[in-house]
Every structure is written in C-alpha cells, then in structure tokens.
Amino acid sequence: MFNVRYPNDSFDRYWQPFLDNKHAVSSTQNVTSADFWNLPPPDVFNTAFVAEQDAPLVLQWPPVALQNDSYYVSLYFADTLPDNSRTCDVYINDYLFFKDLNVTSAGLSVFATQWILSGLTTIILKPASPSALPPLINAGKVFALFPVGRLTYARDGIAVATLIASYHFLSVEISWQM
C-alpha cells in the first residue's frame, strides 16, 4: 500500500492508502481502469479492504472532518478472487447509498454527484444475500467544487489567447498547471 499520484494518475489526484493491514488483501486481478468513466489509476485496484466473514466493513473515511457541503462521492470495487462475485449494501453516514451492489473481478464504481456530508464520514458495507463472501472496497474519492474568487471575463480570455498566438513563433509551451 502506497500513495498514488501523477504519473500513475494522469489527473494528479492524490490517492492515500487506508492504514489498516488487518483488512488489506492484495489482488492480482487485472482491472482495466479505462473501463471507468473517471479513469482511476490501475494501482488502486492492487489492494482491497475486506471485511471479516459475515460482518460489515466499517470505515471512517475520509480521515478528516468535512465542511457541511454537497460532495461528489465515487467508490471503487473489484473482487480479489478470479471469477467470483460478492454482494453488499453500501451506506454513507447510515443512509443507503447503493443496494445489492454486485462486485466482480472486472471492477465497478458507484458515484453520486450531490451527496451532503458534514464532519466525520462513516462508510459501511453490509453483506447482502445471497453473497457467501464478505464485502470489500478498493478505493474512494470525495471532492467538492468551490468558487475560486473572481471570474475571468471573456474579453480577458480573448486578450490572453491573442497574446499567446502572437508569440507562437517563439515555440514557447505554456502550462496552465503550475
């Protein structure tokens, strides 16, 4: 278990491992992250956090208290065993997030674009019938959009684009990610 960032994550998201070796299980499954709409790095599927048999998996995650706001929440799952599946119900702060989630070795994600969170967040994965295997999770992502202050006016954007175009002969590459 290690931190994942750029270049392993092309969007330079920061993926931090959940520090609990008791429930961590390595996986040799090849999950194709290109099959996911938001392209998680393949490395996040190398380890799963697995519950005890017939018990729910309870996580306090993220590890910090969140401000009361509307968040995007994405959770990622891939069975660690080939040709297997397990079914669970996913709760966030005691509210049902997803019912009868069928996790296979191919992997899947579930997400919400507007989920209200505040303070410490608890994720609970409860085994669901007819699953004989305990629930697991590989990764999660929570983020919020926030205002960045003054907006750029269209005329300013046009002026910058014109200025950049006028210096094109210099072959200067400009990066907006500084």
Model feature map: region roles:
Residues 1-178:
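Compositionally biased, intrinsically disordered or flexible polar/acidic segments
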